Amino acid sequence: MLFEATHTHPATMCPLKTTEGKASLKQLFSDQNIKKAGIKLTAAYFSCPKDTALDHKGFFTIDADNAVTVTKFFGTMAVDVRPIQTLKEVAKML
């Protein structure tokens, strides 16, 4: 099942601004950690560091058994997790 996990953080607290934050993101999204979590990361996009707005956003499309698995993967990183489907699947219902 596909899920979209969206993360928002203040630009002033962007993890890409610190060595520790960069290392944490690198570890979280490592192939080993993704495999261990039992998910498939199908797409990931960040508005930072290009975004100069007050808040930065991260968008993660994940294939997983359920939303709980997705939330657990992110640990202490706050995410809004929602089930999604492709536009092609939605179009079939129109």
Where would I find each of the regions flagged by the language model?
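Conserved short beta-strand edge segments in small beta-sheet-based binding/regulatory domains
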Residues: V79-A91
